[in-house]
Amino acid sequence: MRPMRIFVNDDRHVMAKHSSVYPTQEELEAVQNMVSHTERALKAVSDWIDEQEKGNSELSEAENMDTPPDDESKEGAGEQKAEHMTRTLRGVMRVGLVAKGLLLKGDLDLELVLLCKEKPTTALLDKVADNLAIQLTTVTEDKYEILQSVDDAAIVIKNTKEPPLSLTIHLTSPVVREEMEKVLAGETLSVNDPPDVLDRQKCLAALASLRHAKWFQARANGLKSCVIVIRVLRDLCTRVPTWGPLRGWPLELLCEKSIGTANRPMGAGEALRRVLECLASGIVMPDGSGIYDPCEKEATDAIGHLDRQQREDITQSAQHALRLAAFGQLHKVLGMDPLPSKMPKKPKNENPVDYTVQIPPSTTYAITPMKRPMEEDGEEKSPSKKKKKIQKKEEKADPPQAMNALMRLNQLKPGLQYKLISQTGPVHAPIFTMSVEVDGSNFEASGPSKKTAKLHVAVKVLQDMGLPTGAEGRDSSKGEDSAEESDGKPAIVAPPPVVEAVSNPSSVFPSDATTEQGPILTKHGKNPVMELNEKRRGLKYELISETGGSHDKRFVMEVEVDGQKFQGAGSNKKVAKAYAALAALEKLFPDTPLALEANKKKRTPVPVRGGPKFAAKPHNPGFGMGGPMHNEVPPPPNIRGRGRGGNIRGRGRGRGFGGANHGGGYMNAGAGYGSYGYSSNSATAGYSQFYSNGGHSGNAGGGGSGGGGGSSSYSSYYQGDSYNSPVPPKHAGKKPLHGGQQKASYSSGYQSHQGQQQPYNQSQYSSYGTPQGKQKGYGHGQGSYSSYSNSYNSPGGGGGSDYSYDSKFNYSGSGGRSGGNSYGSSGSSSYNTGSHGGYGTGSGGSSSYQGKQGGYSSQSNYSSPGSSQSYSGPASSYQSSQGGYSRNTEHSMNYQYR
């Protein structure tokens, strides 16, 4: 949980103070060495005494088999093996500051407790002290001075080097407390004590310190900020004489009671303020509640030794300190200078000492573990699992805050210059490639940011040197994979470290931690699954494996493309699919040109109105005369625009489509053909106007009494963009052909869109073209009557359908999305010029020329039954590309050049 903002400044000051009073690593190592040497030596002394007793007599051996006291388990010697229960020296345990992890700078006094089977005597103390000197010389080369303190029931060991540490070994036995309880209960003791038995009160105090250490490990060590606050307040007790009487066990109980009763974990600053509030409320006053000692059977006040004046002084000092903290003067309470308002962020180095003891636990006596206190407090068994989970989370969170690869490398090779080699990818997901030269070798790596790229470079350098990279704390496989493959494919636009995934099942994939930084994209900035689907439809992704626990799943997905299988892995199936698709794209389509991708932008599709056969397709925007060529949403019938195209049959400019049941024009929501109208009775009236964005040409053939307009063709200067609009044919009897209107066609090189779909039974007419690089021109010689079609399948089906109207006009409509037909009879010819040739139609000596840029121009040449040429009959299924149909039209010519 993040600390509350109002306590952030207090947290900084408390942690700064804590860092200043915390012992140095050298001091802790000296303590660790002295304690471990003494424990090993005492274990050897215990073995030596045990061998001596076994060699004496069977009588002494029988005496050693006495049943141990019941209360022994509460003193830390229970549940031991039978062979250890016969020993005179049961074990050695750490107590005091060493066991609790409360050592500060300058703390030179260390404590151990040596548990004995019987009441310790002066003779036993002398024997242990004498043999301890011998055993220490065998354990270590360090010199130690051993002193005997019979009055204190202890052995004192002092080292001869800096810092001058003093280790006190207290001798005690659980029998001392058991006998005292029997005396208090009024029982008569049948066994007389030896004359040289050690002081009973000293032995009881040693047993109490053992209980205190176990209680502290169970209750305070796992409490957030508790140990830190106790360390800071221990320093306060040393600096301020008023607080001196609280030093030790009362202070530890007070801090645990104050912090442990909070309803949430607190930061160091807030926890310290809560302890001050507890004291300021009068808890230590004579009429206050006092501090209950949980380690005593009888109700005991841990501050019972304080007199009235001391209690009042402590309460007043706490109130004054609380006022200072409330007004932002906590640094005065801590005895330090105020910190600047803004400090540079530094990696926390207090985490390793927050919740763990300063000295690792001893393994000398495996029979007396220090992790037993949770079993003694039965009422605390329920939250024990939570505490263990919290500790595990904290242990997992600690390693990433250690030195990373970049910091490690800078320590080993200071002054390295990192250079930016390249920056690729789109703006929203760039890929940076950094390099560094180390000992003449150049290393490169890439990442979604310069900082990450530098980190990946450092990982590579450290791996090359055979040194740890700092990522071992996490899952080694994932961490190393990410580092090794970080520079695999810098050309791919992917925020995580990019990996070249191959069809091998043992492929290496980026770690899940990096995939959270952003989406996985191809070098075209698209989702890999989407881009692969554009190239190969209907692919199936299969789940190959699912590994890891619930908190760390790993999915492997496989896809088969063109007979090859590609795999991808990730923390979920979506990520795994993306990497599998990415691998397939890199292997099968490494050099896909971007020119085609530019024409395949997503566009808003026109709503389908004619059923699946006339399904709308994405299209390129046309370039109209004076306005947008195509409205994304078709205008409803009978809309009145500038062209007045609805249900009005007239002649003149702007009328658009004349005739019944014809909706508005294809521009400006029913405004006819833009600002250009088509007059009737004009057989070869053509309009041509060129703009910077396209050339447009339209011709109209006038009809007789029907007044039908001719066909119009709009061609764009852009590749593959054109617009062809038909004119509705009129029957001789002025009956609309199936009540349908002609369809306009938009062509984008390889796909066309049938706009203005109406739910009428009318075939679609499209301009025909093939993609760039696939254009073909079709010409027909004299005397031939043939049909060519180059079409792409559309949802409407690939078949052709013939329509016959009153046995006078026969034409076929191709079901393809794009195709082309060219027809020629005797004496006719069709020309197709330019790099993107369209498909022209000609009949009866007419010619159709189309210019270089290849907008698809279409025209219709039809003769009525009375004309010199007639196309009819079973073999004369006639289809023109976007032909306009009108009766009694003459042959028209349309020339369009760039």
UniProtKB/Swiss-Prot annotation:
Q: Which Pfam families match?
A: dsrm, DZF_C, DZF_N
Q: Which residues carry this modification: Phosphothreonine?
A: T67, T188, T315, T592
Q: List the disulfide bonds.
A: none
Note the InterPro entries from the entry. Answer: dsRBD_dom, DSRM1_ILF3, DZF_dom, DZF_dom_C, DZF_dom_N, NT_sf
Q: Which UniProt keywords apply?
A: Acetylation, Antiviral defense, Cytoplasm, DNA-binding, Isopeptide bond, Methylation, Nucleus, Phosphoprotein, Repeat, RNA-binding, Transcription, Transcription regulation, Ubl conjugation
Task: Write down the superkingdom of origin.
Answer: Eukaryota
Keyword set includes tRNA processing: no
Where is this protein found?
Answer: Nucleus, Nucleolus; Cytoplasm; Nucleus
Q: What does this protein do?
A: RNA-binding protein that plays an essential role in the biogenesis of circular RNAs (circRNAs) which are produced by back-splicing circularization of pre-mRNAs. Within the nucleus, promotes circRNAs processing by stabilizing the regulatory elements residing in the flanking introns of the circularized exons. Plays thereby a role in the back-splicing of a subset of circRNAs. As a consequence, participates in a wide range of transcriptional and post-transcriptional processes. Binds to poly-U elements and AU-rich elements (AREs) in the 3'-UTR of target mRNAs.
- Name this polypeptide is given: Interleukin enhancer-binding factor 3
